[in-house]
Amino acid sequence: MNSSGPGFAVLYRWRLHEGAEESFVSAWSRISELLLSKSGSLGSRLHRGPEGLWYSYAQWPSAEARDQAFARESVDPEAGRQMRAAIAESLPEIVLESVSDFMVLPKNDA
């Protein structure tokens, strides 16, 4: 555990078209894995919330790192199209500054 963490995080929120959840999760997962492995992302999580809202929390080393990653060509254009097709409504993103971080990631014993 660490009392301070990444200084930049973003919360994304969407409403999805009915029946598009599986397609969205697949596309979101593909893009998130590529951003993590190739574009400097520190990782992200996808959550389903109440009232049909979906949330993604993404961490980056800095706002500049995210801006640089998003300025490049899409990490997977087809997954991007698939994700956009599943979204009925995108709500404004919320930029967050980490103040204290005690999140523990499970160890992968595989």
Features from the language model and the residues they span:
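Glycine-rich beta-strand-turn "strand-cap" elements at beta-sheet edges
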Residues: 1-8, 42-55, 79-110
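Short, well-ordered beta-strand segments in beta-rich or mixed alpha/beta enzyme
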Residues: 8-15, 44-73
